[in-house]
């Protein structure tokens, strides 16, 4: 099963925001320790990580150089980074229009479609409701805490 990490998991997994970062950090530790063999994300999530991480409040903010380095060493070196295949782009827009997807929700629809194209079995996110459209493709949507429970159960 391929786990697909959303931006929220990358952020909390790589930047310590306190106790709420714990589950995402546990997932990233499992990636480092190779306990999760198939983990991926979207190129868009990498861009979103960089955008958010370099404009956080000063106590958490990364410099642009540190943001790029963290992505290089922790994401590109350990995860498979996918983009939406060109052949799927128009279909995404058509489906979004048909579903009434408006505003910034198009970005979540894009990420969900990248996860589908990457054959993800689960999207791990702190924003479950943003990815409910993925359910129609048979992709589970779990919070980091739920995902940790799932992988613990599978190992037992």
Language-model regions: role of each:
Residues 38, 80, 138-140:
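Conserved beta-strand segments of alpha/beta enzyme cores
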Residues 1-3, 121-122, 138:
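The start of beta-strands in P-loop NTPase/AAA+ ATPase cores
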Residues 1-41, 56-69, 149-156:
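Short, well-structured N-terminal submotif of metal-dependent ribonuclease cores
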Residues 6, 104-105, 127, 139-156:
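Histidine- and aromatic-rich ligand-binding microenvironments
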Residues 30, 44, 50-95:
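Active-site-proximal, substrate-binding regions of enzyme catalytic domains
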Residues 80-122, 126-128, 155-156:
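Active-site neighborhoods of divalent-metal-dependent phosphate/nucleic-acid chemistry enzymes
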Residues 130-138:
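Short loop/helix-cap segments at secondary-structure boundaries that form the rim of catalytic
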Residues 8-9, 44, 110, 129, ...:
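Alpha-helix/helix-capping structural signal
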